[in-house]
Amino acid sequence: MTFKVWDSSRISTKLNNLIFIFIMKKVFSFILAASMMLAGTVAMAQPSIGIGFANSTDKVKSGSTTNSTNLSGFYVGGSYNINLAGALNVAPGVYYSLLTKSDADSYFGLVDTKVDVTEHYLSVPVMFNVGLNLSDGIVGRVYAGPTLAYGLASNTKVKGTVAGFSKDTKIDNYDDDYNYRRFDVMLGGGVAIDFFDMVRFNVGYDYGLVNRYSGDGDITRHRGQLNVG
């Protein structure tokens, strides 16, 4: 007869992850609902649709060692700029981001490896901004605020080739074995210029406050994202 011994530390980690996911889902739902209700009830809201370049930096720190991974792609989405008072506005929105990275190595011309990482995010920013008229039809803005980010998917595809024979392996980075949280609360800001209420040029940066490493040990994992568009 055998008895299965449960790992109490692993159970505790999974329980903490479940609690974290539950709380973040509630916060995400609340911010999304509040943003859409606010945008829909304010008559003076100015809608805008944007697309641009995105660069994400994922930093994992363990002790004194820090490893960084850069992914590039694009973002697309929309927001409502709602006037609160005077030059002060708030702009809730919803955006989708696609980020990718590809690395290839060859060993002695005999073994080739290729690693592709792809991530998909849904983000709900609530940015407060102050506008300043620079000239007729041109408005400069400085903005800052929180963004709630949710990882829709994150996959790593590994392809190895030896003497002409190849094999592909696809990894779900959100699998429990990889201790990678989907949710993040980011804080950031940037500057923008509006041209005749038709075109906006924007440069912004957001930094993730949540440690996305969900396992045990003295390890932290944070993500930052640069948006230009």
Language-model segments: residues:
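Outer-membrane beta-barrel "beta-signal"
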Residues: 48-50, 193, 222-229
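Extracellular/periplasm-exposed beta-strand and loop segments of Gram-negative cell-envelope proteins
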Residues: 57-70, 99-121, 151-184, 211-221
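Hydrophobic, lipid-facing positions within transmembrane beta-strands of outer-membrane proteins
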Residues: 72-78, 122-126, 185-189, 197, ...
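Outer-membrane beta-barrel channels and translocator barrels
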Residues: 39, 83-85, 133-137, 196-198
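Repeated loop/turn-to-beta-strand initiation elements of outer-membrane beta-barrel proteins
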Residues: 47-49, 87-90, 197-203
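Sec/Tat signal peptide C-region and signal peptidase I cleavage site
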Residues: 22-23, 41-45
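Transmembrane beta-barrel domains of outer membrane proteins
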Residues: 79-81, 127-131, 190-194, 202
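Short glycine/proline- and aromatic-enriched beta-strand/turn motifs that initiate or cap beta-hairpins
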Residues: 43-80, 131, 136-139, 144, ...
